[in-house]
From Swiss-Prot:
Disulfide bonds: none
Organism: Picosynechococcus sp. (strain ATCC 27264 / PCC 7002 / PR-6)
SMART domains: MoCF_biosynth (SM00852)
PANTHER family noted in UniProt: NICOTINAMIDE-NUCLEOTIDE AMIDOHYDROLASE PNCC, NMN AMIDOHYDROLASE-LIKE PROTEIN YFAY
Cross-referenced InterPro entries: CinA, CinA-like_C, CinA_C, CinA_KH, Competence-induced_CinA, MoaB/Mog-like_dom_sf, MoaB/Mog_dom
Name of the protein in its database record: CinA-like protein
Family: Belongs to the CinA family.
NCBIfam families the UniProt entry points to: cinA_nterm (TIGR00200), PncC_domain (TIGR00199), PRK00549.1 (NF001813)
Length: 419
């Protein structure tokens, strides 16, 4: 079963709004076992909508889901375009007019004449009710082997209509007997090409499938399988997932929603240990990542943003001679910051970060992207590492990667039980 998504709206093309509808519908297709290979965005233009319909029909698409362009204004052209393409007249549906009139009355308003446009559907189309808005959608089979759905572009309206009407309709047609289940495996400390080389033999699999994805600050592998149930799909996937974990080792940190801050929190909570941080170049970004997890106060005591050298000396106990001789960006200073945070806040673990995020460097001998990170364990053993993110990356990315590597380094120490 081949389906595709066509999102209509010039505002999407201009980047004025984020197209979250495609992501949602793609995930819903997978739950119903419906494969889809194409997504398109088109402006409010009948000729361009026709061109996409022509392509979809020619390649034998069986389900087309449109979102957007169903409202009462002149630029809402989706229904008109679909009807014209299949040379079918538009018929005003009195039940839709009545529904729109009622909704206006409930809001203490009178329906304006242009709203009647939303009651026009192609002859033979089934109404797809909109419980909250005034623009209904449609379900229509204009030619043999093709079903068209239309939905408003408003995500909340679209999602409710999909769940309450489209999903039951599709299940009644026999869809949903096969599901597509997937697991997004997440990795740190290894590049996409390096990971791909290690698992290259798995890319030839057909069920389950394995596909790599690059993401900000991490690499992902999507393992997916088709089966009659989620449990059956997982049974197909489990050996492959286990093999990937064995190959990746500590570079694998979790799957799906298991973010680095969440993983760190679980590890610290399990060990009943606490964390404090001292930050310079990240300016509180590390603390922000940690506290993005609800309940992080169970293990995160706090942080000190020590941007000035005087703060490093007075609050963290960094040796002034080391600052003078080695500079603020050095592993020696990062180590003292980690110990200083740990001692100042009486935590089990401490992290210190100092670096040059750019766009300029105050030290000609130290390039932009040079960051030193240190970790102090419960026994006051200190570990450190120097990262070189490159001079071509922007300030915010360097700060973000630094915070992520600080967490990832702690994760590796905790997982290796080096404390």
């Amino acid at each position: 079963m081949a389906a595709e998504i066509i999102c209509v709206g010039t505002e999407i093309l201009l980047g004025d709004i984020v197209n979250s509808n495609s992501q949602y519908l793609a995930q819903e297709f997978a739950k119903l076992g419906i494969s889809h290979y194409f997504q398109s965005v088109v402006g409010d233009n009948i000729a361009r909508i026709h061109s996409l319909l022509e392509i979809a029909v020619q390649r034998g698409t069986e389900i087309i889901v449109f979102t957007g362009g169903l409202g009462p204004t002149p630029d809402d052209l989706t229904t008109e375009a679909i009807a014209a393409y299949f040379q079918t007249p538009l018929i005003e549906r009195p039940e839709i007019v009545a529904d729109i009139t009622t909704k206006f009355a409930q809001r203490g308003r009178t329906m304006t004449p242009n709203n009647r446009k939303q009651a026009l559907l192609p002859e033979g189309a089934e109404i797809l009710p909109n419980p909250t808005g005034t623009a209904p959608g449609l379900i229509w089979q204009p030619i043999e082997g093709l079903t068209i759905f239309t939905f408003p572009g408003v995500p909340g309206e679209m999602k409710r209509m999909w769940q309450e009407t489209a999903v039951p309709y599709l299940k009644a047609q026999g869809y949903g007997q096969i599901v597509i289940h997937s697991e997004m495996m997440r990795f740190r400390g290894i590049g996409e090409s390096s990971l791909a080389a290690k698992v290259n033999h798995l890319f030839a699999l057909t069920n389950p499938t394995v596909a790599p994805y690059a993401s900000k600050g991490e690499v992902k592998l999507r393992v997916a399988a088709r089966a009659e149930s989620v449990a059956a799909a997982k049974k197909l996937m489990d050996p492959v997932v286990a093999e990937i974990k064995a190959i990746a080792g500590l570079d694998y940190f979790g799957s799906d929603g298991a973010s680095l801050p969440l993983v760190i929190g679980d590890l610290l909570r399990t060990r009943q240990e606490t964390l404090a941080v001292a930050e310079s170049c990240t300016g509180g970004g590390l603390g922000a990542l940690i506290t993005s997890v609800s309940g992080s106060s169970d293990y995160f005591l706090g942080g000190i943003t020590a941007y000035a050298n005087a703060v490093k000396i007075n609050l963290l106990g960094v040796n002034s001679a080391d600052l003078q001789n080695q500079g603020a960006v050095s592993e020696t200073v990062a180590q003292q910051m980690a110990l200083g945070a740990k001692q100042a806040l009486d935590s089990d673990w401490g992290i210190g970060i100092t670096g040059i995020a750019g766009p300029k460097s105050d030290d000609s001998a130290k390039p932009i992207g040079l960051v030193c990170i240190a970790w102090a364990d419960p026994q006051n053993h200190v570990f450190s590492h120097t990262y070189r993110y490159g001079t071509d990356r922007d300030r915010e990315l360097i700060r973000y990667l630094s915070a992520c590597d600080a967490l990832d380094g702690l994760r590796r120490y905790l997982k290796s039980d080096k404390s």
